[in-house]
Structures are given as C-alpha cells and as structure tokens.
Curated annotation (Swiss-Prot):
GO cellular component: ribosome; small ribosomal subunit
Sorted UniProt keywords: Methylation, Ribonucleoprotein, Ribosomal protein, RNA-binding, rRNA-binding, tRNA-binding
Biased composition (Basic residues): 11-20, 112-127
Amino-acid biosynthesis in keyword set: no
The organism of origin for this protein: Thermotoga maritima (strain ATCC 43589 / DSM 3109 / JCM 10099 / NBRC 100826 / MSB8)
Protein name in UniProt: Small ribosomal subunit protein uS12
Sequence segments annotated as region (Disordered): 11-30, 105-127
GO molecular-function term, one example from the UniProt record: rRNA binding
Disulfide bonds: none
Amino acid sequence: MPTINQLIRYGRKPKKKKSKAPALQGNPQKRGVCIKVSTMTPKKPNSALRKIARVRLSNGIEVTAYIPGIGHNLQEHSVVLVRGGRVKDLPGVRYKIIRGALDAAGVEGRRQSRSKYGAKRPKDQKK
C-alpha cells in the first residue's frame, strides 16, 4: 500500500493489457504463406483429427493456425488470411484461417452460418 506522498510523486501506473494474438501486431488480420498443412489431436475429453496449418506471416512470424469447416483446398505455399481466435482444445493454436479469402476456398454445400465459412448463397435458398 503506497503512502499519500508516494502517490503524489509517482502516481499509479496503468497495467499493460497483454495481447491474445501478438503475432498480428495489433492488426485485425494478416496475410501469410502455408509452410506445412497437417492434422493434430485435441486435448483430453475430445477425440478428432483437427486440420491445422503452419503459416509464415508477412511480418516473418511463424504461427499455427486452425482451418475451420469441413474439407479444405490448402497445401504448401497457399497464401492465406489469418485472424486471431484460439481453438480451446488445441494447445498452442491461437489463430484461425479465414475461409473464402485469398487461396482458402469457402466450405462447399454450407447452408447455415455461411459468412463464417466463405460459402456463397445456394441458388434454391429462399429468405
């Protein structure tokens, strides 16, 4: 507990907020190139093969990014757009690839939540 005198002399220093996506350096998204596309198994109660990509961002930082949706067309040297957002059951995965931007195609046959997966509106869908 500081004394009144200490508060007058030094004041209170505001706490620095730690970024949850430091590799983006304050940007909403960053472009990157896939170095390796693979699968990863999730943490304990869950079981699956989650699709991930190792991406070298335009600022030179390498990150592991999750590929959302069913099926993808990504391979080595694909150019992708990366956003922040962790995957709770994959340790160390703090970024996601944006589907439907650059080389990442949208999810085929997606009818609900299409904007999140870069899917075009189907011809027969009514309002």
